[in-house]
Design a protein with these regions (language model features):
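Helical (often loop-to-helix) elements that flank the catalytic cores of nucleotide-handling enzymes
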Residues: 179-190, 216-246, 303-318, 351-365, ...
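Terminal catalytic/cofactor-binding subdomain
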Residues: 93-197
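Zinc-coordinating Cys/His ligand positions in small cysteine/histidine-rich zinc-finger domains
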Residues: 16, 28-32, 48-49, 58-69, ...
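Histidine-centered divalent-metal-coordination microenvironment in nucleic-acid enzymes
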Residues: 165-169, 201-217, 292-296
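Short Cys/His-rich "knuckle" micro-motifs
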Residues: 18-21, 39, 50-53, 71, ...
């Protein structure tokens, strides 16, 4: 066959002998080769243009794109794996510019998790995650809160949270209840947040999550599991009272802090059924964390007394679960539970009264923020 009888497989033109190109088993003219194929910037293999990966700056074959490159989580730019930056204990990739901004940013990424610093004494420590909204996801605003809370040492940090429309999450290092009340200046932090137009209760997005150290719940894993089973049983048994305490709407609870709905005659059976459901972390008592048990029950608040009352309630539940037997916990009525609360937990008692949850005594209810 003569060269002048060869046909371009793409456009059908008769091929000139000096401009015949073969690619992927097909003969092509030079114009079609340029229009329909490209060369991978990484391995320099030619590929069909329609199969090319990459971005406006890089052209890659599928293999190089999958195994040699990744995408910056923050800005979406394509980066080589060797050029990606990661925060500690995190597998989310960033380009250098975004990584530097994150390191300098007052609002850290959602996956940011520094080594915990424990404040206070005793065995029971509580870390809080408080979501605030409506005031903007502004580093300057976060810095103002950090300056108030972290005068001498880092006690809180701020994080991005995709569930929040126009704000961020305040996270504390683990603290004893006494430290939260008497040493941590939460009232000043909340007042400043409100002054910057943030809200927590008066939103459709915000929650207050309280983490309790698992190590305080028993001397070994078996004892800790027994204590956790009593916690889950208590929450299931007294669900109606706790929902009223939480201030969450039914829809909000179902989405962010669902009930296990596994109440049985014993705490162990209730706990087993709860775990068997595999509901993940969006449940009232989240069991997914290795080092903590997370209470996700509460709606967010920037009212100091409500915040402290929630901490005191979690502390009371945990102490009952640690110190009581299964039988004692299973027989504990709500009225007996609230009557156990010592007068020093004044915020909790006042809040229970305001919600008509304290032996029928009523206290005037204050406005939430």
């Amino acid at each position: 066959m003569k060269d002048d009888n060869l046909i371009c497989s793409v456009c059908g033109a008769v091929l000139d002998g000096e401009h015949i190109h073969e690619f992927d088993g097909q003969l092509m003219c030079e114009q079609c080769l340029d229009e329909h194929t490209v060369v991978c910037d990484n391995c320099h293999e030619r590929i069909w243009r329609d199969n090319a990966e990459g971005d406006s700056l890089s052209t890659l074959c599928s293999h190089c794109y999958q195994y040699c490159y990744t995408t910056c989580e923050r800005c979406g730019v394509l980066i080589r794996n060797d050029d990606a930056y990661y925060e500690d204990d995190d597998d989310v990739p960033y380009c250098y510019d975004c990584y530097r901004k994150l390191e300098e940013s007052a609002i850290k990424s959602y996956n940011y998790k520094p080594d915990p610093i424990f404040y206070g004494s005793g065995n029971l420590f509580y870390g809080v995650e408080l979501e605030i909204d409506k005031g903007g996801e502004e580093n300057e605003n976060a810095e103002r809160l950090l300056d108030i809370a972290n005068i001498r040492e880092e006690r809180i940090y701020c994080k991005h949270d995709g569930s929040i429309s126009d704000g961020f999450e305040i996270v504390s290092h683990p603290m004893s209840l006494d430290y939260h009340i008497n040493s941590m200046n939460w009232r000043d932090v909340f007042n400043e947040a409100v002054a910057m137009d943030y809200r927590s209760h008066n939103t459709a997005t915000c929650g207050l999550h309280i983490h309790c150290s698992r190590s305080a719940l028993g001397k070994d894993k078996e004892k800790q599991e027994e204590t956790v089973s009593r916690i889950v049983y208590f929450v299931e048994k007294h669900w109606n009272e706790l929902v009223k305490f939480s201030r969450r709407t039914p829809d909000n609870l179902n989405r962010w802090a669902a009930r296990y709905a596994t109440i049985s005659n014993t705490s162990k059976e209730t706990y087993k059924k709860a775990k068997d459901k595999n509901l993940g972390r969006y449940v009232t008592v989240n069991l997914e964390n290795h080092y903590t048990v997370e209470f996700r029950l509460f709606r967010g608040t920037l009212r100091y007394k409500t915040f402290i009352a929630a901490l005191q309630l979690v502390d009371e539940i945990c102490r009952c679960a640690v110190n009581m037997s299964d039988k004692e916990m299973e027989e504990l009525s709500w009225s007996d539970f609230v009557l156990r609360i010592l007068p020093k937990k004044a915020e909790l008692i006042e809040y229970l009264k305001s919600k008509r949850l304290y032996v029928n005594e009523i206290e005037a209810e204050s406005e939430e923020m």
